[in-house]
Amino acid sequence: MKSSIHPEYKKFLIKVGSDVFETMSTHPTGEILMDVDFRKHPAWNKDSGNVVNQSNKSVSDFNKRFSGLSFGSKKEAS
């Protein structure tokens, strides 16, 4: 078996605001700073709203500009 072909597996810190999570990874820097809290993602927390639209002005502007388009989906009659 060849030696030293596998990346180093070491402690990895995930920083979200004031919280720090520790795990293991082969990532070269040893830490990552997250600007969006993954715990507030609408897939896991329906009360949080749409995190992407709140934090990214370009996405928000796009959604405002093209909000009336259906992109092929049919709208239900009310």
Swiss-Prot record:
GO terms for molecular function: rRNA binding; structural constituent of ribosome. InterPro entries: Ribosomal_bL28/bL31-like_sf, Ribosomal_bL31, Ribosomal_bL31_sf. It comes from the Bacteria. Keywords: Ribonucleoprotein, Ribosomal protein, RNA-binding, rRNA-binding. GO terms for biological process: translation. PROSITE patterns: RIBOSOMAL_L31 (PS01143). GO terms for cellular component: ribonucleoprotein complex; ribosome. Belongs to the bacterial ribosomal protein bL31 family. Type A subfamily. Binds the 23S rRNA. Part of the 50S ribosomal subunit. This is Large ribosomal subunit protein bL31.
